[in-house]
Amino acid sequence: MMRKLAVLVLAVAMVAACGGGVVGVAGAGCNAGQLTVCTGAIAGGARPTAACCSSLRAQQGCFCQFAKDPRYGRYVNSPNARKAVSSCGIALPTCH
């Protein structure tokens, strides 16, 4: 699991570096690559860092888009991701 997550984080960073991590016009400003600072929290359930919480807040409006994206959905919807969001005091949106 940790190896898969490490590969995903690397892939997200590479996609983001190439501009592919930015979601279309409706999601202008959405960049999954900014969430790589949350790897420890999402991968191992560690307490999220201040940088992670800041990135989660900045991308909060994008959570549903990330959850629906096949590249990120299973990680965004994971129990550890939900725990990290909650630990940062961020409300989880209801996605439709």
Swiss-Prot record:
InterPro entries from the UniProt entry: Bifun_inhib/LTP/seed_sf, Bifunc_inhib/LTP/seed_store, nsLTP2
Superkingdom of the organism of origin: Eukaryota
SUPFAM superfamilies: Bifunctional inhibitor/lipid-transfer protein/seed storage 2S albumin
Disulphide bonds in the chain: 30-62, 38-52, 53-88, 64-95
CDD domains: nsLTP2 (cd01959)
Signal peptide start and end residues: 1-27
Presence of the UniProt keyword 4Fe-4S in the record: no
GO BP field: lipid transport
GO molecular function, a single term: lipid binding
Keywords: Disulfide bond, Lipid-binding, Signal, Transport
Entry keyword Disulfide bond: yes
Family according to the record: Belongs to the plant LTP family. B11E subfamily.
Function as written in the Swiss-Prot or TrEMBL entry: Transfer lipids across membranes. May play a role in plant defense or in the biosynthesis of cuticle layers.
Protein's recorded name: Non-specific lipid-transfer protein 2
Gene, per the UniProt record: LTP-2
